[in-house]
């Protein structure tokens, strides 16, 4: 039923409908969006879409994208190669998104509207997916934006009240998707390249995110049994077939992902050691550097794969590195199998732990 007497709608499933005269072929429609208020949405509309000149708007957008993508000039290769490169480069700007609106922003991390004090607030950064390449690229082509993104992480940590670095910040808050705490890698990389970071605050947030929050994938719960086991033994234990789960922090579908979490956390702790070193925290830097070698605890020299162990320290056998652990190999890895996770450790380190007689 369409209620023609109303000119507004509210609610999660709110919608609007329009009727047009017969023969109408073109409709001009503008709309404003705001996470703050209706008044702010109207201001955003008039600032961003002053009129219905679609051609002028498209040309302005084209110029912005040409300037943005023109930061990298490609020589050589074919036109197809350039198309692939610039299409991929374009997608690195998909996220994170800037939430600031005229100097204010809504944060789902505490449900409040804040002043940004001149520093844009970014979110919707799927860090598990972006820390390896997108963030390092940004440190080379847009250092100011990378600094603002990391500053946004620290605001999130403060706003959540626990000072835990976010792991998967979205518009709706930190959804804690995937595994590990790879925001620490963005901080370590930024410091290594001379970017401006509140190092002390970043270290606190990264350390607490790793130590106080559970390492169980897809969870924002406090550290529990699995975390204590990892600290004492240097790896996340795997369950044997039909062995019941005993840690309530473990997601029933996402499972423990023990190899993925062990390898990912080892890298996170190496990054944390670099930040501690930058702060001249020598003992903590040495401690986390030692922890960073935990990936070796799951390296099976006989097979040259990273292999899950049970809580007694025994390899899970028999084992198929191609199709292990159910949907997405989550019972042992995380959305990849043993062959892919073989390369999760930097290659020079793999060479060091491989048998010298085995070809690399």
Kindly label every feature range from the protein language model.
Residues 94-100, 158-164, 214-217, 296-306:
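Secretory-pathway/luminal and periplasmic proteins that interact with or process carbohydrate-rich
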Residues 352-360:
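Single conserved hydrophobic/aromatic residue that forms the stacking wall/gate
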């Amino acid at each position: 039923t369409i209620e023609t007497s109303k000119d507004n709608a509210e609610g999660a499933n709110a919608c609007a409908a329009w009727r047009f005269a017969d023969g109408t072929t073109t409709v001009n429609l503008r709309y404003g969006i705001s996470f703050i208020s209706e008044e702010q949405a109207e201001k955003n509309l008039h600032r961003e879409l002053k009129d219905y000149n679609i051609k002028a708007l498209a040309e302005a957008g084209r110029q912005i994208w040409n300037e943005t993508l023109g930061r990298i000039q490609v020589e050589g290769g074919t036109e197809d190669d350039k198309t692939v490169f610039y299409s991929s480069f374009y997608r690195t700007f998909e996220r994170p998104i800037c939430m600031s609106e005229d100097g204010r922003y809504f944060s789902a991390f505490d449900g409040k509207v804040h002043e940004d004090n001149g520093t844009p607030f970014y979110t919707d950064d799927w860090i598990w997916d972006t820390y390896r390449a997108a963030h390092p690229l940004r440190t080379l082509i847009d250092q100011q934006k990378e600094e603002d993104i990391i500053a946004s992480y620290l605001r999130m940590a403060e706003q959540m009240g626990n000072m835990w670095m976010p792991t998967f910040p979205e518009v709706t808050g930190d959804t804690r998707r995937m595994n590990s705490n790879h925001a620490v890698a963005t901080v370590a990389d930024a410091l290594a390249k001379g970017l401006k970071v509140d190092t002390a605050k970043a270290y606190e947030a990264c350390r607490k995110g790793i130590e106080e929050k559970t390492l169980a994938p897809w969870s924002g719960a406090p550290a529990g049994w699995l975390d204590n086991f990892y600290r004492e033994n240097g790896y996340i234990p795997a369950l044997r077939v039909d062995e019941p789960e005993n840690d309530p922090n473990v997601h029933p579908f996402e499972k423990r992902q023990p190899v993925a979490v062990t390898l990912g956390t080892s890298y996170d702790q190496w990054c944390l050691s670099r930040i501690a070193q930058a702060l001249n925290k020598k003992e903590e830097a040495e401690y986390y550097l030692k922890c960073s070698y935990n990936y070796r605890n799951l390296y099976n020299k006989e097979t040259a794969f990273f292999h899950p162990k049970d809580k007694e320290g025994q390899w899970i056998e028999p084992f198929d590195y191609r199709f292990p652990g159910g949907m997405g190999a989550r019972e042992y890895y995380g959305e990849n199998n043993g062959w892919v996770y073989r390369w999760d450790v930097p290659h020079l380190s793999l060479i060091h732990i491989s048998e010298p007689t085995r070809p690399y």
